[in-house]
From Swiss-Prot:
Pfam families: Aurora-A_bind, TPX2, TPX2_importin. The keyword Cell cycle applies. Keywords: Cell cycle, Cell division, Cytoplasm, Cytoskeleton, Microtubule, Mitosis, Nucleus, Phosphoprotein. One of its GO terms (cellular component) is nucleus. This is Targeting protein for Xklp2. Associates with microtubules. Interacts with aurka and plk1. Interacts with kif15. GO terms for biological process: cell division; regulation of mitotic spindle organization.
Length: 709
């Protein structure tokens, strides 16, 4: 138990408050007051306490025992940090708003300084606390430690970047042995340990910040200092085999450009026995496709609605009220003149007119193309037979035919079957055919298969180029066979007609149409021959008087003047111009003749100005735009003030709610921190009962067939 007590340390004192007691203990929170008094040190004293610690760190005089605090000191500092923050939170409520904001700004600056100091200096490995407690340095509550920066500590200056030549341009020592795989693994392990220590520190800081209740630290975007980093090639990490070189040839000048293309010798593996492995012929090389994650239909619908482009969504009213987007000013460019594509260039009118000879030649060709087709002469006209219209053939009177119903047919067939069954069959033996005794009847002859011609596989290449020779099949002469005599002893049974599918022959509609037209023409000719034309005798011509058709005399072409469109347009214009000239000449003549007009002004009444009968303009009240805008501005400011008041009320409510939640959380945490031991559970005793099953009797297996009956 003593060892267990030494392992655990508690930050808070072991005193507890008895809430059941009636009297109040005023010194219950004395420990928290001590912590806050130790933390609230004036800035002058804090700087004095920090100076020796900083000097000790710079000179490197800090011992490992001092740098590695024990468990007790760490726990005390953690408790001091957490309780100090809680007390600071209590005191901040009494402070004014401006003072509280200043304190928050200072706390953020110190946090940023701590982070920059941690990133600049490499992480030191913490020493594990030994079981034997050694000499420890006294830790003052009020005085900050050398490892952590205070609130008013000056910001450390960044080290200046020193110029250095890159490793590519430096001449490397060829004789330097490359690191083995073990050394590389050790270096990698050290790097991982450093990263782990850094992560632990960050986690501790975040945990302390979460316990204290301060909000997330807002990091200022500080431009980091450029640090020169050497080139690191992947080939340097490979384990290389270095041959033992003689001592005399330690250094040789190597051409850098030529050495770039040379590859290092690959490590030679030791000759070992070949391990036979089975062939995995059944396994394929195809990778198994991973099953896609299940997505519900609701999620698919949501993703589909989100992925729809913006042009298909409804436009918001706010965007429409914003107004049109500012139009970019486009500079005017020079216009490139182009020739117009006029359609009049494509118009072509016939210049030459056809002459009378050409027109006659065309008409003659048209007459020659027309062919007169005479009908055949009916032979009956020349025979002198009496040509009369044919009488239509007299049709026979319709005879009534009864209906052939399927039911009646079936009834008749049944009656016939009954009649046939009634006839007694008498067997009459007939002589056996002699062919059955001499030859084999009813068994088909065995077909002789063709003899296989052997081909060597080595001549396969020759047969690739040459085409296979087509074997000419001999036309089989159809053998005339007599029908076999039926066996008269067996009754005759007719074979049923097999239902065969009709073979579809190729056809074309053009051939069918052509055949139909030929049949139609043939039928028309037959009808034309049957019909007899009515004979109409022509009058006898007068052989004494020859009547010739009148000769048509064509009138000679009369010359007419050309009626041009230009003349039509020019004539009215000329007429109008002549008329204008005549009118002008007439006016000039009239103006040249002087005619004095009578003096009428003397007899007229003198001019008297008249008074205007319009009424005076009535003044109306007006409202200035400035007054209107001033009223609107007052209303707007009033609404803004109301909004700000509402906002401040809401913020105050949220702040009070958060404070109440924090109080509840603190009270809940205090209740949870009190350890309450649970009683040892009591279980029922296990009653061991002996099993009733008999022991198994071993029997030797009979694998052979000798013992089987």
């Amino acid at each position: 138990m003593a060892e267990a007590q030494d392992l655990y340390t508690f930050d808070a004192p072991s005193t507890f408050i008895n809430f059941t007691a009636f009297h109040e203990d005023h010194g219950a929170d004395s420990w928290f007051d001590k912590v806050t008094n130790a933390e609230n040190i004036p800035p002058d004293q804090r700087r004095l306490s920090e100076i020796p610690a900083v000097n000790a760190e710079q000179n490197g005089m800090v011992e490992p025992e001092e740098t590695s605090p024990s468990k007790e000191t760490v726990s005390e500092s953690a408790a001091h940090f957490s309780d100090g923050k809680s007390q600071a939170r209590r005191s901040s409520r009494r402070m004014s708003r401006k003072h509280r904001q200043k304190l928050l700004v200072k706390m953020r600056e110190t946090r940023l300084e701590k982070e920059t100091a941690q990133s600049d200096c490499p992480p030191t490995k913490k020493l594990k606390g030994s079981s034997t407690k050694g000499a420890r340095t006294p830790v003052i509550r009020g005085q900050p430690r050398s490892g952590h920066g205070s609130n008013t500590s000056p910001r450390p200056k960044a080290p200046l970047t020193l110029p250095s030549t890159p490793t590519v341009l430096k001449r490397k020592n060829v004789m330097v042995k490359p690191k083995s795989s073990e050394e590389q693994e050790l270096e990698r392990m050290q790097e991982l340990q450093k990263e782990m220590l850094e992560n632990l520190k960050k986690n501790e800081h975040s945990m302390k910040a979460a316990i204290s209740g301060t909000g997330p630290s807002v990091k200022k975007s500080a431009v980091p200092i450029t640090k020169p980093v050497d080139f690191h090639f992947k080939t340097d990490d490979r384990p290389k085999r270095v041959a033992d070189q003689p001592k005399g040839e330690e250094y040789k000048e190597v051409d850098f450009a030529a050495a770039l293309r040379k590859h290092p010798p690959s490590p030679v593996s030791k000759a070992a026995l070949t391990v036979p492995k089975p062939f995995n012929l059944s396994k394929g090389k195809r990778k198994h496709e991973e099953a896609s994650e299940f997505v519900s239909t609701a999620e698919q619908v949501i993703s589909f609605s989100k992925k729809t482009p913006a042009r298909y969504h409804l436009r918001s009213r706010q965007r429409e009220l914003e107004g049109p987007s500012p139009v970019k000013m486009v500079r005017p460019k020079l216009t490139n003149p182009k020739t117009p594509l006029l359609q009049t260039k494509q118009r072509l009118r016939p210049v030459m007119c056809k002459s009378a000879a050409e027109l006659e030649a065309e008409e003659l060709e048209r007459i020659q193309q027309y062919k007169f087709k005479a009908q055949e002469l009916d032979s009956r006209i020349l025979e002198g037979a009496q040509v009369l219209p044919r009488k239509p053939p007299v049709k026979e009177p319709t005879k009534a035919i009864g209906f052939d119903l399927e039911i009646e047919k079936r009834i008749q067939q049944r009656e016939k079957r009954d009649e046939g069954e009634e006839e007694a069959f008498t067997f009459h033996s007939r002589p056996c055919p002699s062919k059955l005794l001499t030859e084999v009847v009813g068994v088909p002859l065995k077909k002789l298969l063709p003899v296989t011609v052997p081909h060597s596989p080595s001549f396969a290449l020759k047969n690739r180029v040459r085409l296979p020779a087509r074997e000419e099949k001999e036309e089989e002469v159809p053998a005339i066979k007599a029908t076999a005599m039926p066996h008269y002893g067996v009754p005759f049974r007719p074979k049923l007609v097999q239902q065969r599918q009709v073979e579809v022959c190729p056809f074309s509609f053009s051939d069918q149409d052509r055949e139909r037209l030929l049949r139609k023409e043939k039928r028309m000719e037959e009808l034309r021959k049957e019909e007899v034309h009515k004979f109409k005798a022509q009058p006898l011509p007068e052989f004494g008087h020859v009547s010739l058709p009148e000769k048509r005399v064509k009138m000679p072409t009369q010359q007419e003047p050309f009626v041009l469109e230009i003349d039509k347009r020019g004539a009215p214009r000329l007429q109008r111009w002549q008329q204008q000239v005549k009118e002008e000449q007439k006016q000039q003549k009239e103006m040249a003749v002087f005619k004095a007009r009578p003096n009428t002004v003397v007899h007229q009444e003198p001019f008297l100005p008249k008074k205007e009968s319009r009424c005076l303009t009535a003044t109306e009240g007006f409202e200035l735009a400035t007054e209107k805008r001033a009223k609107e501005r007052q209303e707007f400011e009033k609404s803004l003030a109301e909004m700000e008041a509402q906002k401040s009320l809401l913020e105050e409510e949220t702040r009070q709610r958060q404070e109440e939640e924090e109080r509840e959380e603190i009270s809940h945490l205090r209740k949870e921190l009190v350890h309450k031991a649970q009683p040892i559970r009591k279980y029922k005793a296990v009653d061991v009962k002996a099993s009733d099953t008999p022991l198994t009797i071993p029997e030797s297996p009979n694998f052979s067939d000798r013992f089987k009956c």
